[in-house]
Amino acid sequence: MDIYENGAYDVQQELKIAYGNRLDLQIEICSITHRKALEKVFEKYQPHIIINAAAHKHVPLMEHNCVEAIYNNVFGTQNLVELCEEYGAERFMMVSTDKAVNPTNVMGATKRMCEMIVQSASTHGKVKYSATRFGNVLGSAGSVIPLFKRQIANGGPVTVTDKRIIRYFMTIPEASQLVLQSGAIANNGELFVLDMGQPVKIMDLAENMIRLSGVQGIEIVETGLRPGEKLYEKLLVKTEELDKTDNSMIFIERDNALSKEEIYKKIDVLRDACDTGDDLIAKEALRSVVPTFKRPEDVNKEIA
């Protein structure tokens, strides 16, 4: 299921090529914010396992579209959680992000709120809930590598917001497999953290891609940090602070779940703010319900 028909079509064609007549695949075009349509999908298929990878994820865009980010990321997740309970799903797995750790932007704060919703549901629901948090996926839509490739192909310059920026990366197969493995081993309510290995300097990545391309004279230009952007992301992979699993790359963060009443109060605050249609009001409401939501300038000042 996808809201974006072109993406759904591409996946459909890729799977048809790979599996041919053996493929039993149904495609549904639906937004998780459209409760009635989503309910029809649940009624039709009675799904056992739901993996929620739906998210507005572009940090600078979401800084100026806070209402839409909350509707899609937060209210959409809440719709899925409620329908999982109503239709007797077995497992719900949510894909989260390192940007949810002490978030400095709307995207990260909405994903932190999603984690709180999932963990709260695990305290009173029948479904086995889990969330898996990891960093950037190499080559995924909208990620930095396709951008650098286009910029190099166009003769440059390659743009880097700040030469100090460091990010965690994982390949698409690694990310997919670890998300599935996390969901499979979940008992209920876990917040899984993946060991992403050593972080990479974006400046080094840009220099290496230029060198490997063989193109001469490509300039790298610093453009300045974008709204909501951190210099460093933090995954919290500190083994002394996490519980181990049988998979050496998957850990469980210790966190306290909110009650059903507490989480619904937070959702009501966000709904009231979003009903105004004002992104600034929505952002302040988000800041009030996600205690760890910090201003990026404060965080970057600490680590600069």
Regions flagged by a language model, labelled:
Residues 115-304:
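Strand-loop microenvironment adjacent to phosphate/nucleotide-handling motifs in alpha/beta enzyme folds
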Residues 28-29, 71, 162, 222:
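Conserved residues in the N-terminal Rossmann fold of short-chain dehydrogenase/reductase
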Residues 58-59, 64-115, 120-122:
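Conserved Rossmann-fold NAD(P)-dependent oxidoreductase catalytic core, especially the SDR/UDP-sugar
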Residues 1, 50-54, 92-97, 132-134:
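SDR active-site strand-loop-helix element
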Residues 27, 69, 92, 129-132, ...:
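Hydrophobic/aromatic anchor residues within beta-strands of the central parallel beta-sheet
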Residues 16, 32-71:
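NAD(P)H-binding glycine-rich loop region in Rossmannoid oxidoreductase-like domains
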Residues 1-46, 241:
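N-terminal Rossmann/SDR dinucleotide-binding element
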Residues 33, 100, 137-139:
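Conserved sequence/active-site signature of Rossmann-fold short-chain dehydrogenase/reductase
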